[in-house]
Amino acid sequence: VHLTGEEKAAVTALWGKVNVDEVGGEALGRLLVVYPWTQRFFDSFGDLSSPDAVMGNPKVKAHGKKVLNSFSEGLKNLDNLKGTFAKLSELHCDKLHVDPENFKLLGNVLVCVLAHHFGKEFTPQVQAAYQKVVAGVANALAHKYH
């Protein structure tokens, strides 16, 4: 991902304020509600029968936190996203058979959740930088599929 120094600083500064527990659970929950076909990858998560069930599901929250912790690792290695996410790409491709388009969907949902949480602080410039990052992460996670 090519970010300017200013973009990197903006992404890093905002990310330092992110509550990964809260934002991770909300982002994954919203993905499962807005794009219900993604639920098929989470059969073991129990009740996903309604938006309230999804958003209150402790397994969704826990996995969302795990996802954002991985995303945090990516932010520390923006110049080597493919290397950073190589094992996760392999897992999601070979074992879990996740449609790589879902990585893009989750990235876009994450941007929406960040905008919701940070309001005016999430300026168009910050959003543009985050869109680059989530696209880079989605591309890195899809790398094994190519």
UniProtKB/Swiss-Prot annotation:
Involved in oxygen transport from the lung to the various peripheral tissues. The modification Phosphoserine is found at residue 44. The modification S-nitrosocysteine is found at residue 93. Red blood cells. Belongs to the globin family. The modification Phosphothreonine is found at residue 12. One of its GO terms (biological process) is hydrogen peroxide catabolic process. It comes from Pteronura brasiliensis. The modification N6-acetyllysine is found at residues 59, 82, 144. This is Hemoglobin subunit beta. The keyword Mitochondrion does not apply. Residues 2-146 form the Globin domain. Keywords: Acetylation, Heme, Iron, Metal-binding, Oxygen transport, Phosphoprotein, S-nitrosylation, Transport. InterPro entries: Globin (IPR000971), Globin-like_sf (IPR009050), Globin/Proto (IPR012292), Hemoglobin_b (IPR002337), Hemoglobin_oxygen_transport (IPR050056). GO terms for molecular function: haptoglobin binding; heme binding; hemoglobin alpha binding; metal ion binding; organic acid binding; oxygen binding; oxygen carrier activity; peroxidase activity. GO terms for cellular component: blood microparticle; haptoglobin-hemoglobin complex; hemoglobin complex. The keyword Transport applies. The lineage of its organism: Eukaryota, Metazoa, Chordata, Craniata, Vertebrata. Heterotetramer of two alpha chains and two beta chains.
